[in-house]
Amino acid sequence: MKNLLYKELKLCVPLQTWIFIFLSITIMIPSWPSLVSFFYPLAGITVVFTLSNANRDLLYTSTLPLRKKDAVKGKVLLISFLEMISMLVSLPFGFLKLFLQKGLPEEQIYPELGFNLALYGFVFLVFGVFNLICFPWYYKKPEAKVTLPFLISDLVTILLISFIMAVFILFPEFASYVNSYELPNLLTQIAILLGGLLSFLGFTFLANHLAQTNFQKVDI
């Protein structure tokens, strides 16, 4: 699988996607909602599938000594890898956000999810939902236009992000709670992080299984 992931990275990830992946650094903007920074990587992932279709990547992969389900697994690994990269890249810039916020007047800092462990739990959830929608749908007709599966996936994740953001903006006490590192608050952050991680793993595993099932029915 390492070789397959390497092949995916070399042939299916254009410069535009890397730019979108690294836009998670916008988390450093003090007045910018932290969770929004992780929508950009998902927007860039669409380009991966567009390029794959343009290059007839599925046809090429089918000539390799691989099972059809391994071709799906390779793409799932690639997208999951890119999602993890976007999270890792954001970490130092999240700390920079906290530093920059210290110099702002209190009235310029509005209640939001902020930068903490809970944030990444929700990011895991958002990424998992995206994977669960887009992979099974895409692999029903992988060589058709890829617009609709990713348009719907992006729309659902935007709605999910908006809902999560709205909760913390409308209920400032929630924002204050998750941005505190006292023991009960920290335990809540850890619980949200673990819950999000389990959701991501479960949704992505299910997405991979459903996508493999759909792809087995496709005649390349």
Describe the residue ranges of each PLM region.
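Hydrophobic alpha-helical transmembrane segments of membrane proteins
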Residues: 1-58, 75-220
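Juxtamembrane/interface alpha-helical elements of multi-pass membrane proteins
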Residues: 60-62
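Alpha-helix N-cap/helix-start motif at helix boundaries, enriched for small hydrophobics
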Residues: 70-72
